[in-house]
Structures are given as C-alpha cells and as structure tokens.
C-alpha cells in the first residue's frame, strides 16, 4: 500500500488528534445519539452503499463488529472526495484499501486517476467523431457515384487498363481500430463494393460506336429525298395513295405524258418520212418498256397512231389525186384526242390533266 495513503488514513488522524474514545466507538458500534446532540452522524449502511454502488452487489448489513466511520464533515479530505464527481469508481479497490485509506488517497494518485479518466473520455469522443466523419465520407462517395452513373448512363464507361477493375476500399480503413470501428469498416467495405459493382456494370457495357461520316451523308440524302418525294406528291397527287412507289409511278407517268405532248406538238413541223419512222420506232420502244402497266404508255400509243396517220397524210399530199381526210385531226385543231378522255373513268387518271387557269383545250 502506498505510504502516503497510510499517512493520511483516518486511524492516524484520529490518534494524532488525541481522541481516546475512537476505539470505544468502534467496539460499541453505532448507537443512537443523545438528545443534546444537534447533528446525527450517518450510519455505516447509510453512506457506504451510496459511495460504492459498483463494488457491492447488495447493501451490506451493519453488525456490532463493523467499524463506524466518522461523519463526512469531520475530515476535509473525505468531504472533498464525496464532492468530486469526475473520479472513476470502476477500479477494483479492496475492502482494506477502502477502510485503511483508499478513500483518503494522495493528491498525486487523485490527479493520475482524473487524468486517466479524462483521457478515456477524450479517446471515446475522438472515436465517435471519427466514425461520424467516415459516415459522411461514405455518403458523399455514394452521392458522387450515383451522379457519375447517371451522367455515363447513355455513353458508357471505359475502364483504364492500368487500374484494377474492382478496387476495394478496405485498404483505407485502419485495422487496429476497436470493435466499433471494425463494424463500421465492414459497413464501408460493403457499401464500396456495392458502388463498385454498379460502376463495373456500367464499365462492362460497350460504348456506342461513333457514327461515320458516310452514314451522316446518307441521312442527309434521305432527308433531301424525302422532301423531294413530298414535293412530287404535291404535284402528281395520286388518288388516296401516299407511299413512295405510287408517287414515283405517278411522277413517271406524268413525265411521259409531257414528253408525248411535246412530240405531238412538234410533229407537224417535221414532215420528213425519216423523222416519222424515228418517232414510230421510239413509240414502239416505249411500248416495250420496263413498265408495261404504266398508264403513260397509252399516250405513247396515241403518238404512234398519230405518227402513222401523219405519214398517211403525207402520202396523200404526195398523191394529189387522192382526196384528203376532212376531220379536225387532219387540220391540227385537236391536240388531245378524245380517246385520252376515257382514262378519267379508269382507276388511275394520271395521264389526264386539267388545263391551266384561263386556257381551254383546243
């Protein structure tokens, strides 16, 4: 036992003060005070369990042989011990130390115990702050990972060959932490692994291939072609048909119709038989064209017939004895034959076109 503790024990204090009645009080035990006493000292069972709640599982029963302690106010060291609330009571004090001076320890031991208790409180508060900081870092990391995954959702992520695909966050965590830190490190490891699994799933996705320049030009050409087909549809306007094939077929028929009209208007100015033969051959080639069902070939057939009639009129002119044909067609008054008007009642009337505004058919 410490020497300073023995020197400050209550036995030596009472004997040094010259109190011969102390042993009589110990032998007699606790007796009720006389009516003349104004202050009643507390019993052993009254203040020992209150001072030492962590050392005795049940309250100690008072007996005649148990020593009685002096009142708390009789010794200043004892009163100062009772008033201190920050001294720890979790040390394994023995009963002899408590009775012979454990409660009256020296100032150095008191300061040492207070410093130890203060260091423990600081360590616990530091660990709690560190755990809170780790939680904030994990939350920020998760938020950043979610933002990166949402940004790279439509483009894909390519992992660099130098960095490993699955980098664990367990190396950051100190392995010498206490049990709370170990549990928290396990939570961090699971959260980091889950976030890395999300990142690896995005990394495994193949990035979108860059569109080559040829495809972009084809797209522009398709857009231009679509606009041209729309303009052709406005010109030819097939009856209830909007598909591309019908629009192109109507446009081809319309072009052939215009070509035949030009030929019909220019034939009177070419009276040579060689020219008539050329027109007849051209009309025959059109009859054997790629589109035999195309309605524009009817006009070509008419041109062929008209070429034959013109050749006959030329022959009649060459033979003045023969009587010329007396009809409107021979005089050039009817450029569009009546047979073309029969196509109005057919399914496809692309070859019949209304005259322009202010003009009439001759």
From Swiss-Prot:
It is found in: Nucleus. Residues 209-258 form the bHLH domain. Keywords: DNA-binding, Nucleus, Transcription, Transcription regulation. InterPro entries: bHLH95_bHLH, bHLH_dom, HLH_DNA-bd_sf, IND-like. One of its GO terms (molecular function) is DNA binding. It comes from the Eukaryota. One of its GO terms (cellular component) is nucleus. Its main location: nucleus. PANTHER family: TRANSCRIPTION FACTOR BHLH133-RELATED, TRANSCRIPTION FACTOR BHLH83-RELATED. Belongs to the bHLH protein family. Homodimer. This is Transcription factor bHLH133. The gene is BHLH133.
